């Protein structure tokens, strides 16, 4: 769920 902002883009993090 949700995503985490990383290096100017978003990575999947969990559901």
UniProtKB/Swiss-Prot annotation:
It comes from the Eukaryota. Plasma serum. It is found in: Secreted. The lineage of its organism: Eukaryota, Metazoa, Chordata, Craniata, Vertebrata. One of its GO terms (biological process) is defense response to bacterium. The keyword Secreted applies. Transmembrane segments: none annotated. Its main location: secreted. Keywords: Antibiotic, Antimicrobial, Secreted. It comes from Oncorhynchus mykiss. Antibacterial peptide. One of its GO terms (cellular component) is extracellular region. This is Salmocidin-1. The keyword Secreted applies.
């Amino acid at each position: 769920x949700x995503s985490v902002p990383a290096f100017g883009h978003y990575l999947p993090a969990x559901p």
